[in-house]
Curated annotation (Swiss-Prot):
GO terms for biological process: cobalamin biosynthetic process. Keywords: Cobalamin biosynthesis, Glutamine amidotransferase. The lineage of its organism: Bacteria, Bacillati, Actinomycetota, Actinomycetes, Frankiales. Pfam families: CbiA (PF01656), GATase_3 (PF07685). This is Cobyric acid synthase.
Amino acid sequence: MSGGLLVAGTASDAGKSVLTAGICRWLAREGVRVAPFKAQNMALNSAVTADGAEIGRAQAMQAAAAGVEPEAAMNPVLLKPGGQRHSQLVVLGRPVAEVDALGYRPYKERLAAIVLECLDDLRGRFDAVICEGAGSPAEINLRSTDIANMGLARAANLPVIVVGDIDKGGVFAALFGTLALLDAADQALVAGWVINRFRGDARLLEPGLRQIERLTGRPVHGVVPWKAGLWLDVEDSLDLAAFPDAEPCPDAEPCPDAEPCPEARPASHGGRREVLRVAVIRLPRLSNVTDIDALRVEPGVAVRLATRPDELADADLVILPGTRSTVEDLRWLRRRGLAAALAERAAAARPVLGICGGYQILGRRIRDDVESGAGEVDGLGLLPVITTFDPVKLLGRRAATDAAGRPLTGYEIRHGRLTVEEHPDSAPFAADGVRVGAVAGTSWHGVLENDAFRRAYLADVATAAGRSFVPAFTCFADARQRRLDALGDLVADHLDTGALRRLLAEGTPAGLPFVPPGAS
């Protein structure tokens, strides 16, 4: 097998990222050396490769599904939206400019060459490359400069399958309309369809499946059922829109080397085990919300997003996550009354955790002539930290031990340089952070994925809240692998894998019909 495949979608959040990961997992289990690829990604959730390059979080997840190390070539162009309708342009893992929509256009020709070089490189080193499109391939206002969808497919001669989300409704219109808006050369690369997130008996779809095949002259390669609990690495605001209500995870993922947690000192409530409630403030420019994934699979922990002060009232822990625009989100917190609510929590010794940008916001002052141009502004003053923004972004994976001797790993993606000032009540937190009373902060993303550290911290939170809660021996890495296996199972069980193999080996079949707009 030697080839590539592009997974396009009728819209954002149609299921491209998950289907790409599932195909990678299925192929890897079949013994195929496979890599993911996304030419251009727009996301605030990013990951850091072993050599310190920044790529989209979804591509790192897909690489994990494929069983390979993520690298910059898998996502050569990353756009990270910020304030004032500008985005940070990251090329081959390094930030190169702040651009708006019009300012981005002059870069496209040079970026197209980089994209194709990266794809050629991957195709030379792997048996198969599964490419993920961006948004919809039928964005006709963008087609002339497209480097992520049909522009990529045509330049690299990639067969294309288009996935549509039936759970949102209108999937057949979306599939047919997508094809009809493409020109003849682009249509010639579209090899078939996948229906995603179907609830119910797939036999009920048969009349529609046969009709869309007749209308387009292209087969439906599978109907993927709706499946709860896949939570894997949300990428953007559309993913967060589907964030579940606060329900505790019911099943533990046992960690083979887990030891009893000495920090667990739950209050006595007659033996009843209570739920620990976590509220994550949904900042307007929230980034790397994947930091809370480890809590979402922790049995007995209920995680929800919050945007109002009253939504923090019953939370045992409030998390202030990362942000692409620290000063702007600090101002938003003040306007919404959330800054005052956090100060009240701190005064009442109720736990608050800041991660990266959230840690900076909890500090005393922020000096920012880089990200917002705001100069010096006061933070919330809950931690003795001064943040100074630097044009050079800190990128890298980190490893250390905390004050208790527990090994920690994480990663950094930030422009802010932090100075911890003297405070009579401060103590170290995690590997790099500080804690004053119930308020703590760290610059490291991924710190809660460390099982022993997470158990100890949740035990402290439970004690502060007076909850009868004992952390489970959850192994987050194993939980992630099980969910990646579930994606591979969905592909193996519900897609025409023989057709996928033929597309990878032979490309799009010749002679597929052209469907003009208005055809029926």
